[in-house]
Amino acid sequence: MSVTSLSFPYGESICWYSPDELDRLPDGALADWLLASGSLTARLRAHCSQFEVRVLGEAMLPGLPGEPQLPHTWVREVLLILDGTPWVFARTLVPEALLTRCGDELTALGDRPLGELLFSSNLFTPGRIEIAGFHSCGTLARLAESLGQNVHGRLWGRRRYFEREGDELIVSEIFLPAAMDYILGPQ
């Protein structure tokens, strides 16, 4: 699995919506995955024997269009890998004020999943979920293809807000084609 021909950051501008606003919220299993209120990390672990986080990059960067435009935001992008297959591309945005308060809690995660920190303590309060269904021909499609996964339809994802002391951390999770194939099952 090589992503060397690409470079961090991989995220792209995505239009996110409240599930109430989306005209065509997917039915069945996909909607269940998108709207689940618990930890996606825990749910993914339940579907594999080996779970891995591969960090693609971390840095102070400006937000993309459609993201909060704060002067200083720490961005972390990772792949969540199940039994050797990348399932989820995740992009986390942490405003500088929150990063200053949290310090190493966030910046020293390394290959540990952020979801474990967010759901294992009462320091963060899970908030609203937004979803997106989109046709990617940009960096996410190229990332998927570099991982041996062809984007053959819409990619779906969710964006979750977590509040701590008045600041919001945002986690966007995009289901890669391998995950979509599993969730949707045989067509």
UniProtKB/Swiss-Prot annotation:
Keyword Lyase: yes
Alphabetical keyword list: Cytoplasm, Lyase, Pyruvate, Ubiquinone biosynthesis
Single GO MF annotation: chorismate lyase activity
Pathway it works in: Cofactor biosynthesis; ubiquinone biosynthesis
Top-level taxon of origin: Bacteria
GO cellular component: cytosol
EC numbers, comma separated: 4.1.3.40
Cell location: Cytoplasm
Known role: Removes the pyruvyl group from chorismate, with concomitant aromatization of the ring, to provide 4-hydroxybenzoate (4HB) for the ubiquinone pathway.
UniProt-listed PANTHER family: CHORISMATE PYRUVATE-LYASE (PTHR38683:SF1)
HAMAP family: UbiC
Protein name (database record): Probable chorismate pyruvate-lyase
